[in-house]
């Protein structure tokens, strides 16, 4: 999860992009100390910090008092706590054991200047070779579940079943899934987390396929391979992760692979259309999602699984007290959440998007709408922070540049009083505002029928650059992250008490990893990865607290099964 990289756009004055610069116009993206690495057999450190050391003021962070710290027994025994990752960000082994090239492999290798530190995820966190270590960490922390994604080009190197199924890729995920289950950890699998087979990009433009058939069919076949090979043991599926982010950044701003944007904007391939292509890709994603869910319900229903998709949702607060700013907030939420949620709830895009994007927004056929409506029995919400929404007049003086400009609302980091919405949390775009999560869950309850929800990502990143290096000891003493996680878990309890239908929480991320266009300049993990010393893992204070949380006075474990 990451916001628009405004500096890369050279549009700092643009009203919708102002919020993505800090007060000094700095750019930003989205995620027991040992002096030497452990042996290769045990590359992580589980030394423990007493609970008493994690109260009061730590490194300038005022932590919750002991009575305020959330407890596991606040939640039902079948409520899931876990951690999340994605394939491209952590696996590495980019060209090993038959894996094909992904859009991100191609992007990072051909446009390294588009990554903040010029890096790539050829090795990532080396999890392809260290997955056993990662599962041991999850087990030690008492996690109920692990959310990870399956690399499409690792399973289908050429993107299609006709191009061949890579058995080595199948076997890798089977080993991972089996090991998780042997350790009492439930796998939550994301089928697509932004890594398109490069072969499909070159064949027909990937998700820009104008026929609305080839990418939908190829994705459906990929999903079928996943269901066939893993469905007997995987009971929780997410078809797509953050489609709004993927489409807007890949084809709007161009900061994500394949790096497309309109002429005149600053991206790798400025021959696209930032006002149209995100909507084409988004439409294809929704059609592919509907086909995959239809397939699952027809042929795999006996496996008693859950299936849905995960949305990235940034909370919105009106900039001022005017009715216009309140409406700006609503339009912003329509593009942020409603763009992909309303089609699966009621079969079409939000009214405000239809009114403002007009002919740029594709239409669904009656048959497509029939498959879309109700194509989920669970949904994921990825929440990091909130922002102010300020009205922009609809007039000839304002010309949208990006698809997200169709909200006619500027997204402001600072309110009318010059203050941000909450305390800054390390990387400049995240501010502590747990109330935003509660607001979103109440929207899901009151507007969208209160579906079963999982918080599938929640976390902060610590900046670690050449100009501002983060010492290992400081990274391990991540009290801001600890405080952030505790306050959001407490807010979850409040939301559930208000009737929110929430069933689980996943911290983002299990590991420090490759953070897309930010490269390795931000550390989102609850576990530190020492990339200079054999990718040794060390638990941060946040991970140690989660271990205490998960194991202290825990109700008898009961894995969630579908109703």
UniProtKB/Swiss-Prot annotation:
One of its GO terms (cellular component) is chloroplast. GO terms for biological process: carbohydrate metabolic process. Keywords: Chloroplast, Disulfide bond, Glycosidase, Hydrolase, Plastid, Transit peptide. The active site is at 242 (proton donor), 457 (nucleophile). Expressed in leaves only starting at day 6 after germination. The keyword Chloroplast applies. Residues 322-358, 391-402, 447-450 are annotated as: Dimerization. Gene3D superfamilies: Glycosidases. Residues 1-51 form a transit peptide. SUPFAM superfamilies: (Trans)glycosidases. It catalyses: Hydrolysis of terminal, non-reducing beta-D-glucosyl residues with release of beta-D-glucose; DIMBOA beta-D-glucoside + H2O = DIMBOA + D-glucose; DIBOA beta-D-glucoside + H2O = DIBOA + D-glucose. A beta-D-glucoside binds at residues 89, 193, 241-242, 384, 457, 508, 515-516, 524. Disulfide bonds join 261-267. It is an enzyme of class 3 (hydrolase). Homo- and heterodimer. Beta-glucosidase acting poorly on artificial aryl beta-glucosides. Has no activity toward the chromogenic substrate 6-bromo-2-naphthyl-beta-D-glucoside (6BNGlc). Belongs to the glycosyl hydrolase 1 family. This is 4-hydroxy-7-methoxy-3-oxo-3,4-dihydro-2H-1,4-benzoxazin-2-yl glucoside beta-D-glucosidase 2, chloroplastic. The lineage of its organism: Eukaryota, Viridiplantae, Streptophyta, Embryophyta, Tracheophyta.
């Amino acid at each position: 999860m990451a916001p628009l990289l405004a500096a890369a756009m050279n549009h700092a004055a643009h009203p919708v992009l102002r919020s993505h610069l800090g007060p000094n116009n700095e750019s930003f993206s989205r995620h027991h100390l040992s002096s030497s690495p452990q042996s290769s057999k045990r590359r992580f450190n589980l030394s423990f910090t007493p609970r008493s050391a994690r109260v009061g003021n730590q490194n300038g962070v005022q932590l919750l008092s002991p009575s305020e710290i959330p407890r596991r027994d606040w939640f039902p025994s079948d409520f899931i706590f876990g951690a999340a990752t994605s394939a491209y960000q952590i696996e590495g082994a980019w060209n090993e054991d038959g894996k094909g090239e992904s859009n991100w492999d191609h992007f990072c290798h051909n446009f390294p200047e588009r990554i903040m530190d010029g890096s790539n995820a050829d090795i990532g966190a080396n999890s392809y070779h260290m997955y056993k270590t990662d599962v041991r960490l999850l087990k030690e922390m008492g996690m109920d579940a692990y959310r990870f994604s399956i690399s499409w080009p690792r399973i289908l190197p050429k993107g299609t079943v006709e191009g061949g199924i890579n058995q080595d890729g199948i076997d890798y995920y089977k080993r991972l899934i089996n090991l998780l289950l042997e350790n009492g950890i439930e796998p939550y699998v994301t089928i697509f987390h932004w890594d398109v087979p490069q072969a499909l990009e070159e064949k027909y433009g990937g998700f820009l396929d104008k026929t609305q058939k080839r990418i939908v069919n190829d994705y459906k076949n990929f999903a079928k391979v996943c269901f066939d090979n893993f469905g007997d043991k995987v009971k929780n599926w997410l078809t797509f992760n953050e489609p709004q982010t993927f489409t807007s950044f890949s084809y709007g701003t161009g900061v994500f692979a394949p790096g497309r944007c309109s002429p005149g904007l600053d991206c790798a391939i400025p021959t696209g259309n930032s006002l149209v292509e995100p909507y084409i890709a988004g439409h294809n994603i929704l059609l592919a999602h509907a086909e995959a869910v239809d397939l699952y319900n027809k042929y795999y229903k006996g496996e008693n699984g859950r299936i849905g998709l995960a949305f990235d949702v940034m909370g919105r607060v009106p900039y001022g007290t005017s009715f216009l700013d309140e409406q700006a907030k609503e339009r912003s939420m329509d593009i942020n959440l409603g763009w992909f949620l309303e089609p699966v709830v009621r079969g079409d895009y939000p009214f405000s998007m239809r009114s403002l994007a007009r002919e740029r927004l594709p239409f669904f056929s009656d048959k497509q709408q029939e498959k879309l409506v109700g194509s989920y029995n669970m949904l994921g919400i990825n929440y990091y922070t909130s922002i102010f929404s300020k009205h922009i007049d609809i007039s000839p003086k304002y010309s949208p540049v990006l698809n997200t400009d169709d909200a006619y609302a500027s997204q402001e980091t600072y309110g009318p009083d010059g203050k941000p919405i909450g305390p800054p949390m390390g990387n400049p775009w995240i501010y502590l505002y747990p109330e935003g999560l509660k607001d979103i869950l109440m929207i899901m309850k009151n507007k969208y029928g209160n579906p079963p929800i999982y918080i599938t990502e929640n976390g902060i990143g610590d900046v670690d650059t050449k100009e501002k290096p983060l010492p290992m000891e400081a990274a391990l003493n991540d009290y801001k992250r600890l405080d952030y996680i505790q306050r959001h878990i407490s807010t979850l309890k409040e939301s559930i008490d208000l009737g929110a239908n929430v069933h689980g929480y996943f911290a983002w991320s299990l590991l420090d990893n490759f953070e897309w266009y930010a490269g390795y300049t931000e550390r989102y993990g609850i576990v530190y990865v020492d990339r200079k010393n054999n990718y040794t893992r060390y638990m941060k204070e946040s991970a140690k607290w989660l271990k205490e949380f998960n194991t202290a006075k825990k109700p008898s474990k009961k894995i969630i099964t579908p109703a």
